[in-house]
Amino acid sequence: MLVARMQKMKAGNLSGMEKHNKRIFQNHSNPDIDTSLSDQNYDLMNREGKYKDIVTEIIESQKISQRATRKDAVLVSEWIITSDQAFFKNMDPNERDRFFQEATDWFKERYGEQNLAYAHVHLDETTPHMHLGVVPMRDGKLQAKNVFNREELRHLQDELPKHLREKGFEIDRGAEESERKHLSIPEYKKAMESVKELDVERQKKSQEIIKTVSQIDELQSAKSAL
C-alpha cells in the first residue's frame, strides 16, 4: 500500500526540517535512525544551498507580485512517500531506488520540476522513505491551498499509485483517509506512542480496581469471621 502524507512547512519550519532531512545533527532523539547507514541517504533533486535559499529562489524566479511573501505563508508542501516494510522486504536496491525516482518523476510532471526543492531518500531508518518538498507555486503566486486542495489530494492518492503500477510496482492506493488527515512520520510515531501510553494507563487503572476489589473482599471476609 502506498503511503503519501503531506505536511505544511512555513518559514520557521525549514531549518529544522533541513537538519532532519540532511542529518545535520550531533545528537538525535529518534531511535529509528541508524547513523552508520546515513551515508546511504541521497537527494534526487540535488540542489545546492540551504532550504531557505533554494525555496526563496524558486518563489522569486516565478512570482509576479512585488509584495513580500507573507511571514505565515506555506512555503513548502512536504510529502512523505513510502510503503510498509513488506513492500520493501527483499526488494533489490536498484528497484527500491527506481521506486523513489518514478515517484519523483510523477511529482515533476504534475507540479513542475522547477518547483521541487528537494527529494531526500532516507535508507537509515526502519522503513525506506522519501521527503519530497514542493514549493506550491501556480500562475506566479504562492498558493498552497489551491495547489493542494481536497480534489487534488484525492487525485494524487489515485494517480500516483496508478503510475507506479504502470512502472511495474505492485502497490495499491492508500486508505481513503490519506487525503484528509496528513501526518508526518514523527507525528505518526508520536500518535502511536500516545496510544501505547493510554493502554498502559488503562492497565494501571484496571490493576488498581482489581486491587481495591480484593481489599474489599478481604475486609468483608474479616468482618464475617468476627
Enumerate the predicted regions with their spans.
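N-terminal nicking endonuclease/strand-transfer module with a His-rich metal-binding environment
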Residues: 1-226
